[in-house]
Amino acid sequence: MTNVLFIASVRPQLGVFADSVRKFRAAGATTYLAGTFPLDPVAEELAAMELDGTHQLPRNLNFRSTALRRKARMAPGGMKVWMQAERDSVLRRLARKADVLVALDAGAVYTVWRLAQYYRVEEAHFGLAPALKAVDRVKAKGPTGSRGVLPPLDVVKQNVRRSVDGLPATVMRHATARPVMRSTVGARMWRTAVTAPGVPPKVRIATSRYVAEGMQWAGRTSGAALALAAAASKLTDLGLKAQLLDEAVMKELGKGLNPRDLDKAVAAQLAHADAQFAAGDHEKASFALDRALFLGFHRVLHIDQLSSPLAKDAEGFVAPLYRSKVMDVMKRPQGRKTPAAPAPTDRPLRLLVTTSANDNFLHHILDRYGNHQGVELRYLDLAAQKALKRIAWAGRRVLEDRLAGGTSTYQEEVERLMRPYLDWADTVFLDWSVGPAAMLTTIDPGDTRIVVRLHSYEAFTRWPHMTDFSRIDDLIYVAPHVKDLVESLVPMLRGDSAPRAHLVDNAMDLSGFALPKSADARFNLGLVGISQVAKDPMWAVDVLRRLREKDDRYRLLLVGGDMNPKTSRATRDYRRQFDKEIAPLIEEGVVLKLGPTDDVPSALADIGVILSSSVREGCHVGLMEGAASAAVPVARDWPFYAGKPNSARTLYPEGWVVGSTEEAAKRILETTATEEAWQNAGKLASEYALSTWDWPIVSKAFDKLFLGEG
């Protein structure tokens, strides 16, 4: 009999594992499972598999030395598993008898290599498929077959020519040794090793991953990414190359860094997707394309930093994407079978307003048309129903359906769930051009008119590139500069099949913001909304410092919740720097954090100057509300759009927008020099805001859009 020992640090997928155990038993193997995950909750499932034995490994280090526990806290996950299991006598006995050792997950890999070294187990594997092949090899050797001896392997000085089955634990020990990886020489030698000629792909991949883990443990994140990318450059298999480059890029993105090999990683996924598409495997092609889009539009690149590759050359950034065969398929318009029917004249318009959870900009629209005699309104929150939420954000399935020519089960599911709503509605108004827009355009809308509103956020995501805009009749933009950006990014929006484009401001009831201000408000700067890196509140702090050099009466009031440090490492780093910057100012009473509020008008009553410090915006609602309250508006010339045909300077009146913190301080000092000057400037701003952006004005544009009125 061939003895097989499975080791797992997390619960395996029990269905898959059960099927595999049956295959191992059919091959004449005895099977044992040792795991650091809790075995008791799945005891019945494991018993049904008819394993020859199971063993619960220690789940923690509670009864070990303080020094070891301290070391474990700093160790990689795989090392921790080994620390827990290494002294377990049952595990050692099972390993001593094992012919094949199998790591069921990444956390168990290091333990398997250590056991393979100690007990000279020739067949040590990560994954079930290679382990099953190993059983056949052991059987073929017969009883005379002896275990191979694993000699030390100096991958720094020699070419690595052994198969991954014989890779010794020395590799892992060297790769995770911080002193070696902290050394420039050591790190360079390891990178040389992973690109050595003649190394089998499996060995190259395994070695590069261990090297990357060690470098990251030693604090060399970019070095870890470089090792993986270097190994990938030597691979010919498109799938493996794409996978390794993906891992390299994610190492840096996970630390909030701009990856040096992003272009290569995206190109590799696209090449893999094209190959799978050519082979007729639409599922694999969609997985690779989904990863390419995910990497190319990762939020760390475009949302959680103060700039984005799109700021320099948006069309150039997406050009390689659209040169691929799979994206050529995605950009082909499917169109609609019949044109949208005109609004009915013999009954109220049936208007379906829909979104997925985010209804921040819908309240006034719902209120108006819910009480309009010419409209029968229904509201659908896709996130409120589990089945609808599942299809609304199934990006990978959207891609597969398009690549398969609309023959997937996903389209059937969307048809079944969404057709009743489309059949009822004359017009569908979908807010936010994200997942639900991609979902909805996988099916023909019939004669229902489809209207979608795109704010600003969507431009920095992958969703517009997954949406068939030929099935959208009207696309609403909130500002000209957003329209320019999105049309430069999405080829379909520049073609004959593009929807009608409209520029309509967000629905805001600004009349309630005109509350009396105290004389002290004149010296209070305000920033409404600081929950995103793009708001760049550090710019506002710089303005405050410049003002206080002239007059120490100026203060800064921050309205809104803080940035969520869990969003990304880039967000966490900015939040940490910002908190450090304002801590002494808060102690002095110079900066006041008012936190989130449902009563923004009251908060603005204490603010005399409203700032827009952002690096990019669609239309900055906080600035518009502040202007309506008669606070003096001072808007940064948003760097993302500065100097372009449409920008903050074309969106707001002349004089509101400044090019630097110096200009901002100068404008504030001039407009607040006297109480009369401040009140006059605020009055003019309020009059402009109320006559331009207030809901009674903007609602006419929606009436015209939905009802053809006006």
Label the predicted regions.
Residues 518-535, 541-548, 557:
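Conserved donor-binding/catalytic core segment of Leloir-type glycosyltransferases
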Residues 134-137, 336-341, 460-464, 503-522, ...:
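Acidic anion/phosphate-binding donor-loop and adjacent secondary structure
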Residues 512, 673-706:
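A charged, aromatic-enriched C-terminal amphipathic alpha-helix characteristic of glycosyltransferases
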Residues 615:
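Aromatic "clamp/platform" in nucleotide-sugar-dependent glycosyltransferases that forms part
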Residues 632-642:
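Short hydrophobic beta-strand element within catalytic cores of glycosyltransferases
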Residues 462, 471-500, 508-510:
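A short, active-site helix/loop in glycosyltransferases that binds the activated sugar's phosphate group
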Residues 570-596:
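Nucleotide-activated donor-binding/catalytic signature segment of Leloir-type glycosyltransferases, i.e.
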